[in-house]
């Protein structure tokens, strides 16, 4: 059997098997799916009835809400604008049972308020918002309601009604955890598909799942071997689309989309940035999409969450680890002794060294980086989430997608490759309307990034230390589309690994 090559984020791409090597069930599913695919199908008209209470609000109140939350809605069609759902009481009254888990939240987030009416109305939507803005429920609630409206909650074969694609297994698991809570109340089954584990259990779960949350590589593999048919998908979501393109999944995504029905599919894309590559992808498969932007121009320079207090300390390289210990000692005492702190390193070896250092200083610490297997990563994340570890040392593999509640402080021991990655790192704190705090240890070795960092600080109205200004304010653009933020996470001092395939 061929050795497997692990793609970033743990999404494995095994060598394709011949039809004779596949189990008989996969072939049976494929044959049945083809028969169903050829059945006539039509897209039911989506119905969205605006709440009377929402209709009673004045246009001035609506405009003030949009301005307060920096919400911009761009719609090239001639459809009348839909008012944002500003309160949970404004949600459609039908199937109100699915709203029960919302009782733990006070009000919708801006991205939820703006996208819900559009998605309930059946429109294709592009949502552009910072991480931690509530995007999962923004696309998740309309997904569940769409399945309920169709009356086809139960699935007897591997033909899901909705597919949600995410860049990493961790993010896929987080989406699954949230949607399962809402789906359980109305008997809608959700399953999570990702690489690095055996496929047999996933094939079994696919038989009854109405919603499939998946990483692109594993979903494509299961589609190609006949284990799942996407011909009845009514609702397709690409979450963190920019991240998936950075990781090289564009062809997998396009192949998956081509397997879903164009005329009957509602398509949703969420992204933190809006580069040309993401625009081109959206233009290739979305129909008259409405674009909802939260915050400033997403194609402009990256902007940090203004609720995060950013502190930059210019230090000598040899001082960083001692300073880290001081910062943690100060932040992990008194009433804050149990506060969660996320510590970012650039290299895997650096992360291992820092984790050992902090453990030797009696901090409750866990680590997550590319060298850990799936079980070890989940164990570390669970320890951090439950509080048995209050400090998590991570490389950029954890910089996007991880939704860890109540991270009080982010510390950058080493500045990342780009300022975009800096913004994503510190975005782990200050989520869901909370305030956050980020401290960055900046050295002369990072001076090429000083100008871009200064721009981020100024845009968020943060203090810029004189020591940082001395490095200069020139911004040097740096593209790394092929490798994203991860190529420095590889030890380049080693020779390349030779991959050998068995006969």
Curated annotation (Swiss-Prot):
Q: Domain Helicase C-terminal, which positions?
A: 307-472
Reactions catalysed, semicolon-separated, are: ATP + H2O = ADP + phosphate + H(+)
- The segment(s) forming the Helicase ATP-binding domain are 116-292
Q: Where is this region: Disordered?
A: 1-49
Pfam families reported in the protein's UniProt record: DEAD, Helicase_C
Q: Where in the cell is it found?
A: Nucleus, Nucleolus
Comp. bias (Basic and acidic residues)? 1-13
Q: Where is this motif: DEAD box?
A: 239-242
The GO molecular function terms of this record are: ATP binding; ATP hydrolysis activity; mRNA binding; RNA helicase activity
Q: Which UniProt keywords are present, listed alphabetically?
A: ATP-binding, Helicase, Hydrolase, Nucleotide-binding, Nucleus, Ribosome biogenesis, RNA-binding, rRNA processing
Report motif location: Q motif. Answer: 104-112
Q: Which family is this sequence assigned to?
A: Belongs to the DEAD box helicase family. DDX5/DBP2 subfamily.
Its UniProt domain note says: The Q motif is unique to and characteristic of the DEAD box family of RNA helicases and controls ATP binding and hydrolysis.
**What does the protein in this record do?**
ATP-dependent RNA helicase required for 60S ribosomal subunit synthesis. Involved in efficient pre-rRNA processing, predominantly at site A3, which is necessary for the normal formation of 25S and 5.8S rRNAs.
Q: What is the protein name stated in its UniProt record?
A: ATP-dependent RNA helicase dbp3
Q: Give the organism, scientific name.
A: Aspergillus fumigatus (strain ATCC MYA-4609 / CBS 101355 / FGSC A1100 / Af293)
What does the organism's lineage look like at the top?
Eukaryota, Fungi, Dikarya, Ascomycota, Pezizomycotina
